[in-house]
């Protein structure tokens, strides 16, 4: 049994009729003048920061617990960065933001909705006050793409996120806003990366159906795709293959299966005292994975890989972020996201639980 890594693509999925427009749950509550689709989250971020400012240099506050790709995209757009602290519950440290605001003018604040969650009432009220005072809110829902709440998600001036982390598509990200954006041409999404990743996804599907095929072949192509992604920083639109999938897939099945798998893992790992889910799932929250904290993260990650459970570390943060916030540093050293997505059922979740139990000898 193999769990995680890149999403395989079934050839049959490519024959499904296009029968819907692209929409996410948070969009039910609000209307947006502009929704644009990009090849990657970093393209959506860089595009946003390049075109939302009216002066030469802007200053943004980023959370200390953040992906280096976010930091790099903001820097490429020419913005200055300061980091605000987070709490151990992965919430905004309001006091830290106030301290930074007191040191000089800030144009924007970058808000991340972590691991399927949404904002607490106090942080939401604080952010809305800043928004009223003219601070631009850029809200990243890459971890909470399908999460829904009438207030606490989707409130940013610019709402963006990666789509490809959730679905069997080679690329994809979005930007939604009511703000005016210039009509700037975007490069085609047909790139070496999208082609190679698409091929790797098809090859993985074939490998899973016929284990006589060499796994190394699709892994090599997948690695070539990743290398291509990180050598081409062109802002691109989404590829035609991914755009087509977004108009034909069943979003409700994705949401339902992820919630069922996550809740099943939470309920059946309570006896494992060495791991802790990052937070309890609340109504409307849809997890990107079973995200846990463990003091033995690196050893656990290695053990899971040896047993064909391929996990993500969100994130190994930069030295600047570590220096800015010891809480973020501690979380970065202990966090791990175990796959529980729509590809899997209770059978695969039981296997994950068994592997976790073997690691701790229970």
Predicted features and spans:
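Conserved PLP-anchoring active-site segment centered on the Schiff-base-forming lysine
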Residues: 49-104
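PLP-dependent aminotransferase class I/II
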Residues: 32-36, 41, 66, 110-111, ...
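Short, polar loop motifs at secondary-structure junctions
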Residues: 23-25, 65-68, 141-151, 296-297
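Short loop/helix-cap segments at secondary-structure boundaries that form the rim of catalytic
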Residues: 26-30, 71-76, 147-156, 206-212, ...
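Conserved PLP-binding active-site segment in aminotransferase class I/II-type PLP enzymes
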Residues: 1-56, 253-256, 357-362
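Active-site phosphate-binding strand-loop segment of PLP-dependent enzymes
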Residues: 90-183
